[in-house]
Amino acid sequence: MGWEFFSLETLQELARQYGYGAVFFGIALENAGIPIPGETITLLGGFLAGSGDLSYGGVLIAAIAGAVLGDSCGYWVGRWGGWPLLTRAAQLFNIPQEKLDQARHKFSQNGAAAVFFGRFVTLLRIFAGPMAGIVRMPYGKFLLYNIGGASVWAAITVSLAYFLGRVVTIEQIIAWTTQFSWFALAAVVGMVGIYFVFHFLQKRFDQTIESTIGDRPQ
C-alpha cells in the first residue's frame, strides 16, 4: 500500500540508492501504520539481489528486522493508548461497551493467528500489531508470532522477487503480489462475515426455541 506519488521509478531509485536501509525502513514504517509501500520496496530489494546489486541474505535480514520493529511499534502504541481511544470512538458512535468488550475478547482468542498470518493480508498487516496491544496480548507471545510471521513473509517475498525476477519483470511480480494480498483480504472479510451471519442465525434460532418452550401450556 502507499500514496500514489510513490511511483515505481521513485521506489526503484530509493532501493538502488539506499539498498538494505530502504528495505528496512520501508517495511518498518508500513508495519508501524504509515502508508509507505513497504512490501513493494521489499520486492525491489529481492529483485536487486537477483541481479547481483544486493545480497539475498542482507535483504532478507533487513526485511525481517524492519517488519518486527514496525509491528512492535504498533503493538506498544495500541497497548499504551489504543483502548481508551477506541472506547471514546465507540461512545461517539453509540457502540455499547459490551460489544466492544466482546470484540476485544474475540481478538484476544485469535490474536496469535492474526499477528502471524496478517503479514500476507493487505491492511491487516498494519492493524494486527496495534490490536494485539489493545487486547494486551503478552509481549513475549506477540514477539514470538511476530518474528515467526515476519520470517516466513520475508522469505517468501524476497525469494519470489529474487528468483522470478530473472524471468519476468518486476512490474508483473508486484502486480501478482498485490492481487494476492487483496484476494486474501477479501477471503478474511468473507470468513468474518460468514461467522457473524452464522452467529446471528444461531442466536435467533435459540431465541425461537426458548420462545416456543415458554409458550407451551404447563
Swiss-Prot record:
The chain crosses the membrane at residues 27-49, 57-77, 115-135, 142-162, 180-200. GO terms for cellular component: plasma membrane. Its main location: membrane. It is found in: Cell membrane. The keyword Transport does not apply. It comes from the Bacteria. It holds the Pfam family VTT_dom. It is a multi-pass membrane protein. InterPro entries: DedA_domain (IPR051311), VTT_dom (IPR032816). Keywords: Cell membrane, Membrane, Transmembrane, Transmembrane helix. Belongs to the DedA family. This is Uncharacterized membrane protein slr0232.
